[in-house]
Amino acid sequence: MLKVNNLSKIWKDFKLKNVSFEIDREYCVILGPSGAGKSVLIKCIAGILKPDSGRIILNGEDITNLPPEKRNVGYVPQNYALFPNKNVYKNIAYGLIIKKVNKLEIDRKVKEIAEFLNISHLLNRDVKTLSGGEQQRVALARALILNPSILLLDEPTSAVDIKIKESIISELKKIKHIPVLHITHDLAEARTLGEKVGIFMNGELIAFGDKSILKKPKNKKVAEFLGFNIIDDKAIAPEDVIIKDGNGGEVVNIIDYGKYKKVFVKYNGYIIKAFTERDLNIGDNVGLEFREQTKLT
């Protein structure tokens, strides 16, 4: 179990402000825009940065001031940080070699983790010849082979295309035996992977809970970040807005995604976002119906 208590840190232009949460054997996704403080949080947990105040407790042990190598934390940075002069096998085995594990045990563990992540065919490859997705899997294998108490992932799919991203997410879903803290700005990843979800804004954790917070935000800040329409004290997801015949609204902008369109409708003084397959043009008059609304506090 990971417990973060009142963690604060100022680093360069980024800051954390009294962040507190806990996760057990759950996949936790931390969402937020660039500069929100997500990476500062994960670096503090990994031991790369020392917090200005607060506590980090891992499985009952206070690790706040421990050096990174004594935390039993698996950390995969955004740039993967692989050794370019070593092949895949040696990159994965590196931590075990440093710990002076015997060669037979190293070989067994490397092959086991490589099979788990579907990279057995890459073991003899030079890492410089790997794609971004392959490098990500190697970095993940190098972290998991040390049997960490928690896995920390900093934007693990940010540098790969959509097809590779889907493949990596499929591999991440396999990790069930330890807590995972996954930093991203991708809402789809949070919906797919998150058993717990946190939302960062300006260094503060403004929401934390199960993934239902993505469908029913409790306050305006969270609703705005998630792209909800806000009418008075209610949040309405764009997918819960039905466009129909009528004269209540005027189409003011359209983004065409092929099969469907994202439509912006001026309605009672608000700009309402909706998705539709209807053939519409800017200036068309339409009616709106709202299926589900969440009251904001």
Curated annotation (Swiss-Prot):
Belongs to the ABC transporter superfamily. Sulfate/tungstate importer (TC 3.A.1.6) family. Its main location: membrane. It is found in: Cell membrane. The keyword Nucleus does not apply. Keywords: ATP-binding, Cell membrane, Membrane, Molybdenum, Nucleotide-binding, Translocase, Transport. This is Molybdate/tungstate import ATP-binding protein WtpC. Gene3D superfamilies: P-loop containing nucleotide triphosphate hydrolases. It is a peripheral membrane protein. Part of the ABC transporter complex WtpABC involved in molybdate/tungstate import. Responsible for energy coupling to the transport system. The complex is composed of two ATP-binding proteins (WtpC), two transmembrane proteins (WtpB) and a solute-binding protein (WtpA). CDD domains: ABC_ModC_like (cd03299).
